[in-house]
Curated annotation (Swiss-Prot):
This is Auxin response factor 22. Residues 603-683 form the PB1 domain. It comes from Oryza sativa subsp. japonica. The keyword Nucleus applies. Residues 549-579 are annotated as: Disordered. Homodimers and heterodimers. One of its GO terms (molecular function) is DNA binding. InterPro entries: ARF_dom, ARF_plant, B3_DNA-bd, DNA-bd_pseudobarrel_sf, PB1-like.
Amino acid sequence: MKEVGEVEEVRCLDPQLWHACAGGMVQMPAPRSRVYYFAQGHAEHADGGGGAAAAAAELGPRALPPLVLCRVEGVQFLADRDSDEVYAKIRLAPVAPGEAEFREPDELCPLGAAGDAAEPSPEKPTSFAKTLTQSDANNGGGFSVPRYCAETIFPKLDYRADPPVQTVLAKDVHGVVWKFRHIYRGTPRRHLLTTGWSTFVNQKKLVAGDSIVFLRTRHGELCVGIRRAKRMACGGMECMSGWNAPGYGGGGFSAFLKEEESKLMKGHGGGGYMKGKGKVRMADVVEAASLASSGQPFEVAYYPRASTPDFVVKAASVQAAMRIQWCSGMRFKMAFETEDSSRISWFMGTISSVQVADPNRWPNSPWRLLQVTWDEPDLLQNVKCVSPWLVELVSSIPPIHLGPFSSPRKKLRVPPHPDFPFEGHLLNPIFHGNPLGPSNSPLCCYPDTAPAGIQGARHAQFGLPLTDHQLNKLHLGLLHSGSFNRLDAITPPSRISKGFVVSSAPAHDNISCLLSISTPQVAEKSDDRKTTPHIMLFGKAIFTEQQITSSGSTETLSPGVTGNSSPNGNAHKTGNASDGSGSSICIGFSSQGHEASDLGLEAGHCKVFMESEDVGRTIDLSVFGSYEELYGRLADMFGIEKEEIINHLHFRDAAGVVKHPGEVPFSDFMKAARRLTIIAGDRERIERPLIECLVEQA
């Protein structure tokens, strides 16, 4: 029951509770720290992505810098009075040109008093978030408390009583105290919130899919917060969205938004319901951008759950990211969190090109500068453009994988091409009017709109893109320092199978010489006979998928091309191509999405997915000795009773037959399992989730 009636209209939250409700990846700048303000990102924040065009239209011909260096004057942690959604008001003051040389330490906002600098908390407060099930959100029902939350966050329960029961008091984001009855009962026994929970659900208008957050502050006070699930205009649930930007032609839609849901969103005005949308008006963006460009102080409202990237970014992060000379082929990793912010997962990707996301409306802006491709495209198929400071560079060039036929004592080097000396010819164009500096600016990077690099056979990859070889001969004069020029006049390269990129150069251009890293002994002798064009790699003949297919029975591939169908319908073909010297090279051709089918996991590992999530949690099956240990781990991980898992655990074998785990030895199950998905049962068994293990052969 509610014990506090009226609350003051503007009330600052406890920063610890605010951060727990905002999510683990949210980091607020500290007062007096230096940040960059991106009006382009602010416009996305106001309209879920389509606001950039509207902001540019309202600003008209006025010159607007792509980013403005500011000092944080203050931060207020607040919550919406109606929805309990947390947000912050950040007061910013543009840094005058004369102050740009003065450096101050940039720190993240400590969990102290709102708006003031404070000593960092000695330890992170304990919190727990759970996505509400249909049973939890039922009117008149109770809340099933995961054991971890009950034992570490709630007050200690006296298990000697029969039944163990206590009253729990929790304060929400508005300072209102709620009273719940906590009892440990049932068969099997579990922790429940009964009396008072139904009132809380009705008052907060909670539905299945929303998340509840419990936090124990460093002072021992129990707090409760809410993370509402995103909803479509039609009332349905929306997947985790983080990158909606329909105003940018190719620049990032929802991070985990499937094609069908994307179409549904477009059918309802291109946005649906999104947290933060409607709270930040476009007029506020225009006003803030105008004040920032004129050097006057201004204030912005920031909604951490609005599913758009931060538009107030720590200055040191931006400067460090833009000192990197970004170019296609670089490998990186990027963090994403689940909808309920319970897990943060890192995903690997490759930069495909470097270009301004919207050169017409926001020229010279580093916002969403990197176009990327992902190792797991089925999960991140719509995240196409990201900002450099959001990724962590793993390798500046694609890795070199030496096959077993290569001698470990030999040094791998790219032979010089007569028409393209490699040293001293790489250009570093920069942005015009770059506020971060002149020609030695950290905003230097390589322009590239071509696909990333030569991806050879899986046994041998090296990171010098073929288009770089051809730059000197074809279009070296098209690039010059000081701009990002799109190479529209260049014939786009043709992609051969997955990972092979061969430029559409004239026939007399010796492509095989550019791809050949070999010794004279293994080089093939040319003759007057008509030969099939091929690629030479380490002195071995690499045949394309089209050549293998067209060769049929006339050209021998030992032992031939075999097709293995993966569970997701993608074929994986392998073939052995003879090089004429008695040895052969095994080449793997995989269609788009094959790498995602095995999830890039090591042997004995698999990923576990909740039905409502698109980001999995990796577990190591090799540490378990039996199904019982696995059941216990899943029960602790998802807050599901162990008995329910035992009764409803099924898996599908390679033939597609659904079986009970008891029919297969655990050792076989451990070797084959790659993906486990926890799905809800039908309406009659809504409280007894069905766990389906989708098994794929490695």
